[in-house]
Amino acid sequence: MSWQAYVDDHLMCDIEGHEDHRLTAAAIVGHDGSVWAQSATFPQFKPEEMNGIMTDFNEPGHLAPTGLHLGGTKYMVIQGEAGAVIRGKKGSGGITIKKTGQALVFGIYEEPVTPGQCNMVVERLGDYLLEQGL
């Protein structure tokens, strides 16, 4: 399966039990900042934004004072899982980022999708990739 298929079929799909509820944008990005696959709606990000995200995975709490920035959008960092998941909130939407051995799985959402639904979609794919050694 191509990386684009993972984004299209496992991240940008209808959320279980909620037809027409899907993430706003999603991507799989290598730890080096190279995009493996992304939805057409995923924001163009700056290298320093990706560096900040990677630093927060290695040094949990790094982004808390400044917020998480992606594509020029600032998210307030909320509870995550140190070294494994970063979650951010902005208005009625937010972001979930799951770290795997080689990649970061991104999901961005707006209402009516809930934070829990975004977490489920992103973390399920991230956990699967971890199980596959990726």
Curated annotation (Swiss-Prot):
It holds the Pfam family Profilin. GO terms for molecular function: actin monomer binding. Its main location: cytoplasm. A motif (Involved in PIP2 interaction) lies at residues 84-100. GO terms for cellular component: cell cortex; cytoskeleton. It is found in: Cytoplasm, Cytoskeleton. Keywords: Actin-binding, Allergen, Cytoplasm, Cytoskeleton, Disulfide bond, Phosphoprotein. The modification Phosphothreonine is found at residue 114. The keyword Oxidoreductase does not apply. Disulfide bonds join 13-118. The keyword NADP does not apply. SUPFAM superfamilies: Profilin (actin-binding protein). Phosphorylated by MAP kinases. Binds to actin and affects the structure of the cytoskeleton. At high concentrations, profilin prevents the polymerization of actin, whereas it enhances it at low concentrations. Occurs in many kinds of cells as a complex with monomeric actin in a 1:1 ratio. The variability of the residues taking part of IgE-binding epitopes might be responsible of the difference in cross-reactivity among olive pollen cultivars, and between distantly related pollen species, leading to a variable range of allergy reactions among atopic patients. Belongs to the profilin family. This is Profilin-4. It comes from Olea europaea (Common olive).
